[in-house]
């Protein structure tokens, strides 16, 4: 677990410092990697479309220790992002006990946005199973956030 967290932190730091912003950000729990090669078959058509049209995309894979599905080598391990968001939610809830979950996620997004030098801002965010959708939709208020599994569009 600690090695995955450190690896994830290094990937996220490298992305925040060295990469240009993505046009499309994909975020999903690891247990959706159900293909034989460890890729997420639900995002395969979206990745193909992004590559076909020259859009820069990034995939962040949420940790899931309860699954035997392998990690996708094309995605950034999302352990550091996941634990940072979880810790910030708990701290903000402690200081603002009457805040709604939307208010908390908005505050979390502002902090994460500043810590990543606005590099996680994308024009489109696509998630599966509503994972981090509120946080991602608040990273870039001008972007669009979609939940692929439930067909929900935010922003």
Each model region followed by its residue ranges:
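Catalytic-core helical/loop segments in enzymes performing group transfer/polymerization on anionic/lipid-linked
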Residues: 1-155
